[in-house]
Amino acid sequence: MDINLIKQYINSSLPNDKESLIQYYGQLKQILNALSDKEQQQLLNNNGKISEQQQLSIENNYKVIGSIEEKMKSIEHLFNNLDVSDSNNNNSTSPVFISLDNQNTVNNNNNNNNNNNNNNNNNNNNNNNSLAPTVILDNNDNKKTAEIILPDHHNNTPQQQPEQQVQQQQVQQQQQVQQQQQQPEQQQQHLTEEQIQKQQQSQASIQQAIANMGEKKRSSSRHSGPPEIPPEEIKFDVKTDLLGGGAYGKVYKATCRGKKVAVKVPKKQTLSESELKSFKNEVEIMKQIFHPNVVLCLGACTKPGKVMIVSELMQTDLEKLIHSSEVEPPPLYERMKMCLDAALGINWLHGICNIIHRDLKLANLMISKDKTVKIGDFGFSQVIKTGTTLSDQKGPKGTALYMAPEVMMKHEFNEKADVYSFGLILYEMATCEELFPEYSEIDPFYDAICNKKLRPPIPDSFPKSLKTLIQKCWDHDPNKRPSFNEVTQRMNEVLTDTAISGLDAAMFWKYNFIKPESESVPWNEFVYKLSSVVNLPTQVLSPLAQLFVSQSYEEEIGGVVTMERFDLMNKWFGNFFNSKYGPAILYEMIELLKKRWFHFDISRDISEKRLRGRPENTFLLRLSANDPIKTPFTISKTKGSKPTHKRVSREDVQINEIKQFPMGYKFTVPLDGNELVFGSITQMVEELHRIGNLSIPCPITEIKVPYLTD
């Protein structure tokens, strides 16, 4: 397990609703159990003898364990008080959480039961999976896929707790609540002042989260397995609400308890005992995961003929977005951001939940309304212990086009199979091309991937960081593939290379700011680094915040510079990192900010609204987004009572022209059939104003001019 990832999770802010907070608590409990088992196993393996490095690792883990226990106990205490208050009003008892001391006993018992039942589950799988694997070749007009499906595809099933044991836990927990209420002063005496302050801060944050949950309290009785939702509460029309479908079944847009949701309906509605276990296991796996890049499972219905999984409603998936014939795909940088979202979600599955997805593909990467990518469809997912492997004895499961060769060859595999799939996803997202269009049969495809080790050709135009990551991910040897923790780190470099086109600018960002979540940097930090590179004081550069700070982040203290905005500045104004021309370019930028006629990067439509009703030759200069390198500026002015627009082109100068053009560029503007050339934008505007082509600088306000159609 990734300790750094766990620390981030522990220090993350609490969910704002009760259901998510309960899931968060359950995730903490799983991490706690896994860490405790890991330390005990390490001591057993070494017969109690450990090295200094192992000792440091164990001490670090115990610190993390302590942090988890402290946060869990605070949540328990507050929820217990909430439940006791409700039970007094309702004459019922329904404790939410089981105390840690009692839970350890329960966990030990459950671990023994799970160990005893593992062999039984494996035997049941072998007995029930008598059907041969099915290969499905889906030859649609838009997409050609091959899926390999087995009826029973889960090895791990959660164990049910006996009712008597749950009742005993509830009694024990109530006793603990009473003791906590009766002896608060004694507990306080054993805490230092710093510990008391820390506990109060933790409880205050949790109280704030609980305050947002609403007055209506849901039933808090504990049960294992997915939450059962009555079928009559899931409402949708099979004709009008269809979102998509595949070999497994169909997905519909629905309403459940007033909330818009997605409902996955399997084709097979009458399930055998083993199939029902598999279905519940899929839901249970989804229920264990709480992460912004994983689709949230809300519950399920297991009633025969009404079998369904209910999850949060997403807008679309990456396959529809990338391969749509009606809409152009997003720019490369945005597509790579989507890949980073997916990598973060998978890293969480591997690092915290020990879950292998096993069916990663564009169709299973969902997109929310805010363009966040989330991992979905856990039909083939399996829980795997760290350092162990799995194997498909009766045939591989998943989608063949994205399937790792070791899985296809029925060899042992681990989480690196997901890494292989991600390599193909990364390639597909970068090229917007379908995978392996030349193959329609499984046998030649198997030979190409497994024996000949063929992979799609990577275009030379790709940034080196992207090419290298793709090649590492789809390496034939699983041991040479990176972990998803490494993938997420490398994706930050890929984002920089795809967001920032200039070599010097990209190197500046990588050297100074590349780190996890490094898509933006505070202005104060940015200008300090820029000052040290271009050898200009921060006081001189400070006005540039008006250009560099992204408008969507202005509300933050000092503002934020995003990679996209930084790249645009480098395209619009040129390479201000150049040792010869850089200072002149930066001073030109600062001078432009003083001019009333400079209107930043407003759109053509806004410029025309500002010019409406103005006198002849009223003008403004704006930055152009159409081609920011070749035609970075546009002059908009009134002519004959109508707005007109002229683009200003820019090109590099020759070595013998440097004295005439100190910024390293020359700017050209058409005028009366001729082309006028200037060494700077300010020089150009001053000359056009002198000869009468431009007159009054346009203010940033608009004049309300009535039209006949108004």
UniProtKB/Swiss-Prot annotation:
GO terms for biological process: signal transduction. It catalyses: L-seryl-[protein] + ATP = O-phospho-L-seryl-[protein] + ADP + H(+); L-threonyl-[protein] + ATP = O-phospho-L-threonyl-[protein] + ADP + H(+). Residues 83-136, 189-232 are annotated as: Disordered. It comes from the Eukaryota. The active site is at 359 (proton acceptor). It is found in: Membrane. ATP binds at residues 243-251, 264. Required for proper chemotaxis and phagocytosis; proper spatiotemporal control of F-actin levels in chemotaxing cells. Negative regulator of the PI3K (phosphatidylinositol 3 kinase) pathway. Predominantly phosphorylates serines and threonines and tyrosines at a lower level. This is Dual specificity protein kinase shkE. It comes from Dictyostelium discoideum (Social amoeba).
